[in-house]
Regions:
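Active-site-adjacent "lid"/gating segments
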Residues: 49, 54-59, 95, 102-129
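Conserved active-site beta-strand-loop modules that form the wall/rim of enzyme catalytic pockets
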Residues: 44, 156, 173, 178-181
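Surface-exposed recognition segments
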Residues: 18-22, 58-62, 78, 86-109, ...
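Short, flexible loop/turn elements at secondary-structure junctions
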Residues: 41-43, 48-50, 68-70, 75, ...
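Domain-scale activation on soluble regions of proteins
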Residues: 1-30
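Short aromatic-cysteine micro-motif
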Residues: 11, 58-88, 116-171
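Bacterial peptidoglycan biogenesis and beta-lactam-recognition machinery
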Residues: 3-10, 14, 89-91, 152-157, ...
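Extracytoplasmic and endomembrane cell-envelope/extracellular-matrix remodeling and assembly machinery
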Residues: 21-39, 43-45, 50-52
Length: 254
């Protein structure tokens, strides 16, 4: 369902007339002022429980040691992207990973996917055609490279997937599901993971390389997949998904 929507948008965005296949859609929910959710860390358990449905890459449950950290209550906004762009964000090497900077230069990237700046406003192409976005609406269609650079610019970082899942089972519960949220974690098997036999085992196991994990679900994600343990994954230059970022930062160990 979600991939059908994003594939249609990707195809229509390449069309010279940029058609819409449905009427205008409502903007993403306004988020309000940002605050920090502080978590003590410690030894936590992540992964899907044994009962109930989950994909094989969500198993097995295992323990992870987390240092104290904080997550933002909201996703990064178009207003914050404005500040990044105004500061020369797409042309400042110090904010970019080496591969990310090479990607920006090779593809002349100066805005999120499907987005363009028209004077003082942002326009983004989506299922309903092009519409104006801005303010505290969450930024969408970001690559991992962009998400990482924007987080650095804002004096923060991306969360690990373990940090994200631990928070989603606590104070972050009910605060996600608008955009897939990039994490800093490489897509890899959990300790003790064994791919199933035959074609079923190939679905996830063979993709566990050169990809980054996203968490949280988006406005187009089926409700059954919006769960704390669900692991989405894409290469770092992917921008056709409804992907954004949530800031994280370290806290002092007391």
């Amino acid at each position: 369902q979600e991939l059908i929507v994003t594939d249609i948008v990707a195809a229509f965005a390449e069309h010279p007339l940029r058609p819409a296949y449905r009427g205008p859609i409502a903007p993403a929910p306004r988020q309000g002022a940002a605050a920090w959710l502080e978590l003590a860390g410690g030894e936590v358990t992540i992964g899907a429980p044994a009962d109930g449905f989950a994909f094989d890459n969500e198993h097995p449950r295992h323990r992870v040691l987390l240092a104290p950290y904080a997550l933002s209550t909201r996703l990064v906004t178009w207003a914050e992207l404005d500040a990044f762009v105004d500061a020369g964000g797409y042309a400042t090497p110090s904010w970019w990973l080496s591969d990310g900077l090479d990607w920006v230069r090779a593809h002349h990237v100066d805005a999120p996917g499907y987005a363009r700046r028209d004077g003082g406003r942002w326009l983004v192409f989506g299922p309903g055609g092009e519409r104006e976005v801005g303010g505290d609406e969450p930024v969408l269609f970001l690559s991992y490279y962009e998400a990482d650079a924007i987080a650095r610019f804002l004096g923060a970082r991306l969360p690990t997937e373990a940090e994200w899942e631990h928070a989603a089972r606590g104070p972050l519960a009910g605060r996600h599901g608008v955009a897939w949220e990039w994490t800093s974690s490489a897509y890899a098997p959990y300790p003790g993971y064994r791919a199933g036999a035959g074609a079923l085992g190939e679905y996830n196991g063979k993709f566990m390389v050169n990809q980054l994990v996203l968490r949280g679900g988006s406005i187009a994600t089926p409700p059954g997949h919006v769960r704390p343990s669900y692991r989405n994954f894409w290469p770092p230059d992917t921008r056709f998904q409804l992907s954004g970022l949530r800031l994280a930062r370290d806290l002092e160990v007391r």
